[in-house]
Amino acid sequence: MMTPFTSKNNNIDNKYYENTNPYDFTQLENFEQRTVLDRIRSENRVPVTGPPGTGKSTVISHSCFDLINEYSPVIVVSPTNAMVNSILAKIDFLAKQANLQLPRGFIIRYGNLSELSYSHSCLKEKYSIDDLVQQRCCSSSAYLVDKITAGRDYIHNARIILTTDYSAKDLGNVVQAGAVLIDEAGLVRLDRMGMLFSSVRDNNGKIIVIGDDKQLPPPSHDYVANSIFLSIVRNFKPTLLRTEYRYNKDILDLINPYYNYQLVADFSVKEISTADIAKRDYRGTNNNVRKILKHENKTVFVDTDGTSREQRHFINTGEVSIIKDIIDGYQSMGINNIIVTTPYKQQERMLQLYLQKGLRIGTIDKFQGQEDEVTIISMVRSNSKSDYQEALGFVNIPRSCVAFSRSKRKTIIVGDRDTLIKNKFLSKSIDTITRKDGFFIWRY
């Protein structure tokens, strides 16, 4: 059956496409994803939660095509250009999979032209009203006005608009959305969240907030914005995406307590390990490193046993030395996809100073939303006399969740056990690792 896309744009009205909603729920093998799509179709305010790797962007991309006939335009918003491009790539894939030849202007990637890319086949043009206004080469002001008017019409006729929350700040003045899907909603600032809510044209429009309520709040420490997301989650009974498609079961077990043990690892990643990517065995002579690098141990705690004392200002050079040895071991095996992270900026600078250039080094907060094959975490604190708040109050549940969920195949925590067990969340994680034979004391 042939079904038209309804739109004010005559160029689109007169075109017909077979199976305009080809993304029926049976094509999604994941039950939670089908449940979310069903709920988005039937409700106007829907919160969706889930840790990284559970298919939140998959839900967004399918929802776009499911909503366009009744709720056009669908505006998709995410905090960063990288996140927006990731969703665009999934939309592009779905369009190709269904053999849809989307017309010019059907999908718009809205924002600053210098930040955008033509790498996706479904993206025919890039456009920003601000860029038009900033052009000074126009022969007359009337010509400039005509271009701006044409640009506004172009946006009005779009069916799917993708943008960052920053670029979306003036989009509401140009077009009213039938549906707004907010990706990583817990990271969107308060003022921008309000603008996005007001961009929906009426009470019958849809607002879909998607994120992880166990992750960190916005970098600006806009805790009010985060509380809005949490309030939505608490009041509208979110659907949790439970199936993990990114990291193995042992890594999942570290964060599962924070999700009330509701998460499961998909069979495709359940048993993945560094053995899958190692080019050769470790042939070094460091017995500490040899134990830590064993493929069967997918989560490891390296206990410095109080011998690597924390210096002033949240710096621990002993842990830096241990991490250097571990990295050297991995690189000798041909494994270079490694994240090195820490809760503290001072330790971040120390790691950057002493470890080789080109490594991915940063604080836990900076790595939120990123991933790699192996993650090494420097916990720094090593002071048995410190009370809980002084020693580890900064390492809360969201920060722990982010740290533990950066890697696909192996997570290594380096720290002083006697200090870290004062934090009940870290203590639980250390116990989990110990039960899986991943606890090692670094012998000097």
Predicted features by range, described:
Residues 20-29, 311:
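Dynamic helix-loop-helix/coil hinge segments at AAA+ ATPase domain boundaries and subdomain interfaces
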Residues 43-63, 369:
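Walker A/P-loop
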